Amino acid sequence: MATTISELVDKIARLENQLVEELKKQQEEFHYTVEDNKIKFEQIILDTHRKLKVAILPWLKSATLRNVISSPSIYPMVIPIAFMDLTVTIYQNVCFRLYGISLVKRSNYVVMDRHNLGYLNGIEKFNCLYCGYGNGVIAYTREIIARTEQYRCPIKHARRVVGTHRRYANFVAFGDAEGYQTKRLEFRESLKDTD
C-alpha cells in the first residue's frame, strides 16, 4: 500500500510539472513574459486590453443587485485574513527557527498580479487584489500548518479527509504505532531542507 501511495504522490508531482509547462505555453499564447516578478505584455496586447476594458460606471450599471448587496460583507473579511497573515508569520518565525524547520516563503503563496491586466477596471482590479491576497494567505497558512503537523503529528486520520495538503500522503497510517515510532524523527529531519 505504501508503494501505491508513493507512486500516486510521484504521479501528482509529474502532473504538477506538466501543468507548469502548459502555463508556459499559455504565456506564449497571450504574449506576456514574467521577468523579476514583473509582467510584461507586448504593446499590441496592451492596446487590445485597453479597448476591452469596461469603464466603472457601465460596469456598475450591469452589476446584479445581489453582487452590490453582498459587497459590504465581503471586504471586511480582509481584517481577519490580515490578522491571520500576521500571526502565522510571527508563529513560523519563532517556532520554526526553534524547531529547525525551513521557513515558508510567503511570496511563493501570496501572489497579487492580476491588477496588472489592462482590461480590468478599478473595481475589478481591487476584487482581484482581495481574492489573490485572501487565497494566498490561506495557502501560505496551510503550508505552515502542514509543516507543523509533519513535525508534531505525521499520522493520517482514520476517516477520509477532503482536500488534504501535499505532505499528508506521506504520513504514517492511522494505527501504525511502529511506523510512527520509526519514522517520526525522519519526518522532522526532512523539514530542515524543505522549500
Question: Where would I find each of the regions flagged by the language model?
Answer:
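Short, non-transmembrane cytosolic segments of multipass membrane proteins
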Residues: 2-45
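A broad, low-specificity signal for short, low-complexity segments enriched in glycine/proline
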Residues: 53-54, 89-94, 112-116
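A transmembrane-helix-recognition feature enriched in membrane-embedded lipid enzymes
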Residues: 64-102
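Compositionally biased, charge-rich terminal segments
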Residues: 34-76
